[in-house]
Amino acid sequence: MSWDDDDFDVPATKTAGVSWEDEDNDDPLLESWDIDEEEVARKKKEEEAKKKAEKEALKQKQQEAKNKKLSQKSGERKLLDIDLIDEETRQELLRKAQVTSDLNNAADLFGGLGVANDDDFDVNEHPRERAAKLAAAKQAAKPAAPRLTRDSPLEMHPLFQPTDKAEYEKLRKALATSLQQLAEDSPLNYSSALGIDLIRDAAQPLSLENVRKVISTLNVIVKDKERAERQARLKKAGGTATGGAGKKKAKPAVKTNVSDMYKKDAGDDFDDFDDDDFM
């Protein structure tokens, strides 16, 4: 027996064909699959910050150049003013500057009545007059208080800017005086359009405990007014506080002893009969 006598069927193998068309059918790859989005955002922020810093630096340089130019112009103007002054005026200015400097040094010993850099300084002026003038100028330099009108908010008034308990009490007393005057001028408008609603609005921000205190205070006022009204009513009606409102005074009773009168009359009649009448 030999291997040649055996028949073997060798399976045919099909060679896998590779073509460019198969490559075209592959899924498309991302162009930048390894790019980090956070890195891109960070670089973008850095670029924006850099541009902003460059812009700020450029703006600052421009401002510095502008200030330098203005300073040069100012220096040139002062220099021209000095050049135009004649020699006599120059000497006078130097003398005045020296006197001013000496007076300032001496004024340090007398309460700081300095005169430096004052073009209106008069060498012959008395120090007291100058102090009064400086005080008046300082007072005039203060900002004037705003003029209050009907449209001005109440907060502009100094009274409505309290900072401590004493100032709050001062505000309360001022308001009470003004409100009482309004109530006397127009009681109807005061009660219907101001008083009642004002009490409600003023009590709105208070706590529950404070609102109860307000109610207790109002109850005391109610009792006082009821008592005063009752006394006024009694006084008008001519009564007394214990007799009731409008009750007239009781008239004294006239005593008539009827039984005594009849007794007296009966006795008189019996006295008129004689003994002969019964005979």
Curated annotation (Swiss-Prot):
InterPro entries: eIF3-like_dom_sf (IPR023194), eIF3j (IPR013906). Pfam families: eIF3_subunit (PF08597). The keyword Coiled coil applies. It is found in: Cytoplasm. Its main location: cytoplasm. The keyword Coiled coil applies. Keywords: Coiled coil, Cytoplasm, Initiation factor, Protein biosynthesis. Signal peptide: none annotated. GO terms for cellular component: eukaryotic 43S preinitiation complex; eukaryotic 48S preinitiation complex; eukaryotic translation initiation factor 3 complex. GO terms for molecular function: translation initiation factor activity. Residues 20-39, 268-279 have a biased composition (Acidic residues). It comes from the Eukaryota. Residues 40-67 have a biased composition (Basic and acidic residues). One of its GO terms (biological process) is formation of cytoplasmic translation initiation complex. Residues 34-74 form a coiled coil. Residues 1-74, 229-279 are annotated as: Disordered. Component of the eukaryotic translation initiation factor 3 (eIF-3) complex, which is involved in protein synthesis of a specialized repertoire of mRNAs and, together with other initiation factors, stimulates binding of mRNA and methionyl-tRNAi to the 40S ribosome. The eIF-3 complex specifically targets and initiates translation of a subset of mRNAs involved in cell proliferation. Belongs to the eIF-3 subunit J family. Component of the eukaryotic translation initiation factor 3 (eIF-3) complex. HAMAP family: eIF3j. This is Eukaryotic translation initiation factor 3 subunit J.
